[in-house]
């Protein structure tokens, strides 16, 4: 089991951004993080009732809070998958259509500036519940 911590989330983001920068040096997004936001996100994730809710909430909160200077949505997907794997599941994004729909949902969340819309969270819960498989 891999414990998802603030430090691990930062490490995931940095590693992911380094690979991105290698492939797209002209699109450098910067590397930085807000440890307080990340700690708050993890605290709130733990309050969720089940692993699907935790994964969906993690996806939403990272996309909404933008705790990293770049790669927030990509980092959110990796972190949500870790939470699922710790419970014996994995996120299975089968095709480009699935990927694009998740991206659309995360952009919806990102645009919600006052608070996360419960309807969008419900869509994320449904998305995750239909795209997990036992490992």
PLM-predicted stretches and their roles:
Residues 1-135:
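FIC/Doc superfamily catalytic core
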């Amino acid at each position: 089991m891999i414990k998802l911590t603030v430090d691990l989330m930062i490490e995931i983001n940095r590693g992911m951004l380094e690979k991105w920068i290698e492939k797209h040096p002209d699109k450098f997004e910067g590397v930085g993080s807000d440890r307080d936001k990340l700690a708050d996100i993890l605290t709130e994730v733990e309050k969720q009732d089940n692993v699907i809710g935790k994964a969906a909430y993690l996806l939403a909160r990272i996309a909404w809070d933008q705790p990293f200077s770049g790669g927030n949505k990509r980092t959110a997907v990796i972190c949500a998958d870790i939470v699922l794997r710790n419970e014996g599941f994995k996120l299975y994004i089968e095709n480009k259509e699935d990927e694009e729909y998740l991206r659309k949902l995360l952009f919806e969340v990102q645009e919600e500036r006052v608070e996360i819309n419960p309807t969008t969270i419900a869509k994320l819960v449904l998305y995750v519940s239909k795209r997990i498989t036992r490992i």
